[in-house]
UniProtKB/Swiss-Prot annotation:
Extracellular topological domain: 1-4, 62-67, 121-128, 184-185
Alphabetical keyword list: Cell membrane, Membrane, Repeat, Sugar transport, Transmembrane, Transmembrane helix, Transport
Biased composition (Pro residues): 284-294
Naturally occurring in which organism (per UniProt): Oryza sativa subsp. japonica
Family affiliation: Belongs to the SWEET sugar transporter family.
Any Gene Ontology biological process: carbohydrate transport
The protein's name: Bidirectional sugar transporter SWEET12
GO cellular component: membrane; plasma membrane
Subcellular location field: Cell membrane
Region (Disordered), start-end ranges: 256-300
Quaternary context: Forms homooligomers and/or heterooligomers.
Membrane topology: Multi-pass membrane protein
Pfam families: MtN3_slv
All copies of domain MtN3/slv, residue ranges: 8-92, 131-213
């Protein structure tokens, strides 16, 4: 009866852990569509990969089939996440992630396994140490998403804090706590107590900052002011580009009306636009000749 209950709880734990593993899928689909990692961080996924690797090693030592199956899937999926992240991360973030993976997921994991296999001869002692190390990094998995709390508080937005990851981590922590309790495996039960607390803290943070309209009133006001300034600039540009716009002046308008009503004279054309400013050759007729002089008359 107890074994059946343990197996049932373990199955539920595997299902919830699988949902935890799949929770970042929308995040990486967004990364793929936008071809950019934006402000997402790789630390939670690198830590999750290391935790899955350590629990996989622990499951091999204890011959725990349920832990073995779910952590094998976890290693595969977390590796795919990091691969997608590296493909679309900017140069600086990509370099940091590569260093992190090489130092933590390769060098550190290899050092732990080599030390336990070569230096610890007793199997029970090896299992105890492997369980303690796995429990420590399980806590790191729960804490890792909290690295973006500062960003959430500063921006007053939970856009880059996956809600479903925190939600399923909380449920998974509850189930795995009872699994470890029933199995009397305190390396499994203990970290999930703090995991539950960290998960609840993340969900509370999500509730507080989930309303972007309420929490970004200042940002929206600033954006509205920028739009207003932009509209004014566009209006000013349109006025400057208009060919016949003048300041509003009553006297000037009246003078313009009088000038428009005045008849056209040679000295002043009716419309300045009608003036042809090109050179004009005018033929001036010669002046009239004076009448011929009368012959002189002699007087007798």
């Amino acid at each position: 009866m107890v074994q059946a209950l343990v197996f049932a709880v373990g199955i539920v734990g595997n299902i919830l852990s699988f949902l935890v593993i799949l929770a970042p899928v929308p995040t990486f689909y967004r990364v793929y569509k936008k071809k950019s990692t934006e402000s997402f961080q790789s630390v939670p996924y690198a830590v999750a990969l290391l935790s899955a690797m350590l629990w996989l090693y622990y499951a091999l030592l204890t011959s725990d089939l349920l832990l073995l199956s779910i952590n094998s899937i976890g290693c595969l999926v977390e590796s795919l996440y990091l691969t997608v992240y590296l493909l679309y991360a900017p140069r600086q973030a990509m370099a940091f992630t590569l260093k992190l993976v090489c130092a933590m997921n390769l060098a550190l994991f290899a050092a732990v396994v080599a030390a336990l296999q070569l230096l610890v001869k007793a199997t029970d002692r090896r299992v105890t140490l492997a369980g303690g190390i796995g429990a420590s990094f399980a806590l790191a998995v729960f804490v890792a998403p909290l690295t973006i709390i500062r960003q959430v508080i500063r921006t007053k937005s939970v856009e880059f804090m996956p809600f479903w990851l925190s939600f399923f981590l909380t449920l998974s922590a509850v189930v795995w706590f009872f699994y470890g309790l029933l199995m009397k495996d305190f390396f499994v039960a203990t970290p999930n107590v703090l995991g539950l607390l960290f998960g609840l803290a993340q969900m509370v943070l999500y509730v507080v900052y989930k309303n972007p309209k309420k929490n970004s009133a200042v940002s929206e006001a600033a954006a509205a002011q920028q739009v207003e300034v932009k509209d004014q600039q566009q209006l000013q540009m349109q006025l400057q580009a208009s060919p016949a716009v003048a300041p509003l002046d009553v006297d000037a308008d009246a003078d313009a009306d009088l000038e428009a009503a005045a008849p056209a004279t040679p000295q002043r054309p009716a419309d300045d636009d009608a003036i042809d400013h090109r050179s004009v050759v005018v033929d001036i007729p010669p002046p009239p000749q004076p009448p011929p002089a009368l012959p002189a008359v002699e007087v007798a």
